[in-house]
Amino acid sequence: MVSTDIEKTAVIKVQEEILRNKEYLSEYINSNDKTPMWDGNIYVYNNPKKEKKHYQGKIETQVKGEEVKKIKSGNSKYRIEVETLEAYNKDKKGTLLLVCKFVDLDNYQLYYANLLPIDLDDILRKAQNKNKKGKNGQIWRWWERKIRRRN
């Protein structure tokens, strides 16, 4: 599969997952996106009406796809360039990395990593000490569960 199809597949699977939890989440994620770092945002609300007064914030989101021969159980790893991590770190807000590993359209698994500023500082310090251009980072299996409103 060509890279644009891999990215599009990953974005579609992420959008489907957000739709499963649509009561409190809205996504604005583009495929074939040409922005430097992020593919879009996930907006969080504390009420299913999703009016401005119920807006809680947005999560900067990067979606990656990877075609694999087999979906492995448990968590996984994903390689990301140090230059990209440095760009995320300049924003000082954090980034939600969503990775879709798939065999085909029906056989896939979503993973995530919360790249918070404190985590990015630590990852970058370790990568620079070892003079690395890329870093394999832990990504966690996205468990299918309903997201509930905090009281």
List the model feature ranges, each with a label.
Residues 50-54, 85-91:
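Short, charge-rich binding segments
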Residues 57, 73-82, 108-118:
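"Short basic amphipathic alpha-helical interaction patches in structured regions
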Residues 87-151:
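Acidic metal-coordinating catalytic centers involved in nucleic-acid phosphodiester chemistry
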